[in-house]
Amino acid sequence: MMNSPATRYMLFSTGGVRYAVNVDYLDEISELLQEYPIPQAPRFLRGVVNIHGKLAAVFDLSLYVGTGPVKKGCNLLLLKMPETSLAIVVEQMERMIPGDEIVSIEQGAGPSGATTFILADGKAELLDAEHLVDSMENSFVA
């Protein structure tokens, strides 16, 4: 069940939008590291970073969804994915919440048509990490 106490989510915001990601997809949270650009990559793909000897693509989620580039003072959220290493640029880390803090769930209510969590202190759009990677890969093919 999505809102069981055993399921935990990390809350963060970027581009003026608040997100939640299941911690099962999180590998690490890091300060912004030296980025190396990728020639001819889309604007939302800022480059790659070296995290513990492993290269990860740096993804600007706010540029991707159209809310503008992230501001200064950012963190990286390194996602744990089976076939790729992806680091999302995040403007503000909030906190980790247990699933039972979710008051209600609205399907298809977020800015991107995603699931929205209603919390006691506001809303958060659920970030589907697998869907994000798939849609990012499809943007290279198009």
Label the predicted regions.
Residues M1-A142:
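An acidic, low-aromatic, low-complexity terminal/linker signal
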